[in-house]
């Protein structure tokens, strides 16, 4: 399973279109990503050279999602954030920190984690495949963190799922 993106839309060399979506235990995440990728498909059918997340895509995405933006489909807390998000949809729900966190609430079998923006500066955390980082400071919308092994610095979104490192000796 890809961890860097939830879905993808591609045109093959022979002109066919392919949509791939990761397997999710979260029905709302799956539905939203499917509609996101279908918006790419419909825009590609109609307009050959359009920006991937430009105005054409945003309008098509809104048109596809609006008919189901109601409490029959989405829980009230998620619906509230979705309606706000759809005013100017982003290329990924991950960039809408609050919406992303509400969607996460509906993940089944999710292991325990903390969001990076909920831990203190100076805290050591584990991310991804076990790399240890120290949270430094916020820079605009992202957090500057240092990999303890390589000393390289990385920027993380506040909704990055991390595990607090319990052992104080690195």
For each feature predicted by the language model, list its residue ranges.
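Metalloprotease/metallohydrolase-associated module, dominated by Zn2+-dependent proteases
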Residues: 1-24, 48-169
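Active-site recognition of the HExxH zinc-binding catalytic motif
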Residues: 32-45
């Amino acid at each position: 399973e890809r961890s860097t993106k939830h879905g993808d839309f591609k045109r093959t060399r022979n002109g066919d279109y392919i949509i791939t979506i990761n397997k999710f235990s979260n029905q709302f995440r799956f539905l939203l990503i499917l509609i996101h990728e279908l918006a790419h498909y419909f825009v590609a059918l109609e307009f050959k050279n359009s920006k991937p997340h430009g105005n054409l895509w945003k309008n098509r995405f809104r048109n596809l999602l609006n008919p189901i933006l109601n409490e029959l489909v989405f829980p009230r807390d998620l619906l509230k954030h979705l309606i706000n998000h759809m005013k100017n949809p982003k290329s990924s729900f991950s960039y809408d920190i609050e919406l992303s966190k509400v969607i996460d609430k509906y993940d089944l079998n999710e292991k325990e984690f903390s969001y990076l923006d909920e831990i203190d500066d100076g805290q050591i955390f584990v991310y991804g495949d076990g790399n240890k980082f120290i949270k430094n400071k916020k820079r605009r919308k992202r957090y500057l963190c240092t990999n303890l092994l390589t000393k390289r610095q990385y920027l993380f979104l506040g909704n990055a799922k991390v595990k607090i490192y319990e052992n104080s000796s690195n």
